[in-house]
């Protein structure tokens, strides 16, 4: 999921394909805001993976049918370098475009994504002036802090690329207050695998699982680092320089990028290995006999010592030669990186269950231009 150069198909003053409003332009260039779930939102995760593509280390192929996100409050602020050790601090807002906009990232879009060949992005809106500063033109000599929000679905949202199924799914999102919805199928395709408990019977887990994950995780992403600024030197501890800078009489692209692997991580540390076994272990048959798992099935589940529905300890399973479980325990358990686990605790201070753990990791999935990390502010009860 690294940045690669590519052609950008962009409208300068008119935004087509049903995207949102744009401000009136002056002479300082413009910014095209787009959204992408990268190649993985389009094609999912194969197993075994091709080349160096990401994969689920426990042997699952994961494919998406829909990946709906509600974006809002795309904004620019002054002084992205205000606090070298606190990325969340910036100057005041100088421009903002408001939606909300509903996008199905699985459907892709007409633009080439920031990851290059095979990736797609959908145009959201165009900003052509500092609309919170009297429509002043953008200043090509200034870097602006970039941010956006993922918000609860709303019937008033501008639905940009939803088909009939997407419309129905989005209505469910709005009814339930979900911000993000994953719909898809996981199929176990592991072959040569090892386990920390050879006595455990993995045949007790279903081999095909439908998943439907509706996340209650409104989140603000601010002052994002920007891979497009490379090779500019970032602050210590950061990968890229912060902010976005325009060019005179040209369009600069700012892509809100959603990384789809975050809910499946084994730890809260960024880019952790992905697993599906803990989800499969909680799946239940629906009326048609199909195994289905939702986020509600994760409530009450101890993520530090997973068990299957029969109450048996779930071991680590590795179906990738390069993966070794992170600890020597037979029982699979995930690492919350210092955030306490407390089943009856305050959700603002502790993870109560696997539901909280998954939602927390999912809330970090917003980036700028493929891999630019943003300051994350969770707008729901959650540990910092």
Regions found by a protein language model. Give the residues of each.
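Bacterial N-terminal signal peptides that target proteins for export
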Residues: 1-10
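C-terminal motif of bacterial Sec signal peptides marking the signal peptidase cleavage site
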Residues: 15-18
């Amino acid at each position: 999921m690294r940045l690669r150069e590519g052609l950008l198909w962009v409208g300068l003053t008119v935004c087509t394909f049903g995207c949102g409003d744009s401000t009136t332009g002056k002479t300082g260039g413009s910014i095209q805001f787009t959204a992408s779930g990268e190649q993985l939102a389009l094609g999912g995760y194969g197993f075994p993976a091709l080349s160096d593509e990401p994969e689920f280390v426990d042997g699952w192929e994961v494919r998406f049918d829909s990946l709906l996100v509600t974006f809002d409050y795309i904004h620019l602020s002054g002084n992205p370098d205000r606090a070298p050790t606190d990325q969340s601090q910036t100057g005041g807002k100088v421009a903002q475009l408001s939606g909300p906009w509903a996008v199905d990232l699985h459907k892709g879009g007409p633009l080439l994504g920031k990851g290059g060949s095979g990736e797609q992005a959908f145009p959201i809106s165009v900003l052509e002036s500092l609309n919170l500063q009297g429509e002043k033109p953008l200043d090509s000599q200034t870097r602006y802090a970039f941010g956006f929000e993922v918000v609860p679905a709303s019937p008033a949202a501008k639905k940009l690329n939803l088909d009939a199924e997407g419309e129905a799914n989005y209505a469910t999102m709005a009814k339930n207050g979900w911000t993000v919805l994953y719909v898809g199928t996981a199929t176990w395709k592991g072959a040569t695998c090892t386990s920390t408990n050879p006595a455990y019977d993995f045949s007790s887990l279903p081999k095909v699982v439908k998943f439907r994950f509706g996340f209650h995780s409104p989140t603000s992403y601010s002052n994002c680092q920007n891979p497009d600024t490379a090779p500019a030197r970032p602050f210590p501890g950061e990968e890229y320089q912060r902010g976005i800078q325009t060019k005179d009489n040209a369009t600069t692209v700012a892509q809100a990028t959603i990384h789809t692997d975050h809910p499946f991580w084994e730890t809260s540390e960024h880019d952790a290995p992905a697993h599906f076994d803990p989800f499969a272990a909680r799946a239940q048959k629906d009326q048609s006999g199909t195994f289905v798992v939702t986020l509600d099935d994760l409530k009450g589940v101890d993520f530090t010592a997973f068990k299957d529905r029969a109450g048996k300890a779930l071991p680590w399973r590795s179906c990738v030669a390069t993966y070794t479980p992170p600890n020597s325990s037979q029982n699979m358990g995930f690492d919350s990186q210092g955030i306490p686990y407390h089943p009856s605790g305050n959700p603002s201070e502790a993870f109560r269950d696997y539901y909280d753990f998954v939602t927390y990791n999912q809330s970090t999935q917003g980036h700028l231009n493929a891999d630019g990390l943003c300051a994350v502010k969770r707008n729901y009860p959650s540990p910092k």
